[in-house]
Amino acid sequence: MIDQNKLITKWKKAFAKAKNLTTLVNLKNTLHNSDLKPLLQKIKTATKLSEKSSLGKLYQSLDIQLTDLLTSYKKTFEINNQVSQKPSLDVMLPATEFTNGSNNALYQVIDNLVEYFKSFLFTINFDSELTSISDCFDLLNIPKDHSSRNESDSFYIDKTSLLRTHCTATTLKAVRTSKKTNNPDIRVVSLGAVFRNDSDDATHSHQFTQLDFMWIKKGLSLANLKWFINNMITHFFGENTFTRFRLSHFPFTEPSFEIDIRCWLCQNGCSICKQTKWIEILGAGIIHPQVMNNMGIGDTENITGIAAGIGIERLAMLKYGIDDIRDFYDNNFKFLTQFTD
């Protein structure tokens, strides 16, 4: 019969002489083969069930003790090894400085404007960049022969759908599908990418970002539109920003205006304002009665709406003095890191 105490003492002496972890593992395998493997052979050749059971329990007990000894000596060896080794890292060296991230200049402009519209309880609406010809053109009163409908100006997907050319299509859809009442107060902002079939240059891009809003309510007038736009411009550009409303024409508003701000770089004209002393920033107007009807708004004698469309890149270029729209999309890290929140 095997003397367990004598065998374990032998194993301990053998493990104590090991010089490294590899030797410990190899030694465990050697001891198993020399001392426990013969026991397995006895189990196989035993003829009595009671003998097999007794030998099996003995083997299991010894195998567990051998494994526990290996684990114990490995821990001791690792602790001693850690104490004797010098740290591979000098913890007194200064840490690597992390670069703080910040929003892209376009998103800083968007956040500024969204903050303004939220203060007036507008719903911020994001929708698919794919729209129908009906929402993009027909319901917005845009004539069949208008140049924006041409395939040379827009990106058509099929005969009924295209990539939206303005966010007004998205705003119209939001208003059209909203719950209607006899006394509506609908405030919607649409925001996202729009697409025009333009050649990319310093001031044009086939894709850019637009913000569009509609406010529909009884009694809204041109005075409300002017106040709201002027207030938004002051919020964005700061006090003492002078504005000018010029009559224009958009199929979906009547009357229609283009809004300019006074050039802050010059007194008598410069290359930025093209010698006019004014810089165009957005288009706005009173929503056309036919468009109101198309959106399901009745009683256009009393219920009116104000609206505007704003190019985000244009505002960012003016605010930050950027002269090439392509800079926003070129992933130039030096350019992007100039704009910290």
Swiss-Prot record:
Cofactor: binding comment: Binds 2 magnesium ions per tetramer.
Residue ranges that the Swiss-Prot or TrEMBL entry lists as coiled coil: none
Binding sites annotated in the UniProt record for Mg(2+): 254
GO molecular function, one term: phenylalanine-tRNA ligase activity
One Pfam family recorded for the sequence: tRNA-synt_2d
Assembly, per entry: Tetramer of two alpha and two beta subunits.
Domain of life per record: Bacteria
Name assigned to this protein: Phenylalanine--tRNA ligase alpha subunit
Family classification: Belongs to the class-II aminoacyl-tRNA synthetase family. Phe-tRNA synthetase alpha subunit type 1 subfamily.
Alphabetical GO biological process terms: phenylalanyl-tRNA aminoacylation
Keyword Transcription regulation set for record: no
Required co-factors: Mg(2+)
Location in or out of the cell: Cytoplasm
Encoding gene, per UniProt annotation: pheS
Major site of localization recorded for this protein: cytoplasm
Substrates-to-products reaction catalysed: tRNA(Phe) + L-phenylalanine + ATP = L-phenylalanyl-tRNA(Phe) + AMP + diphosphate + H(+)
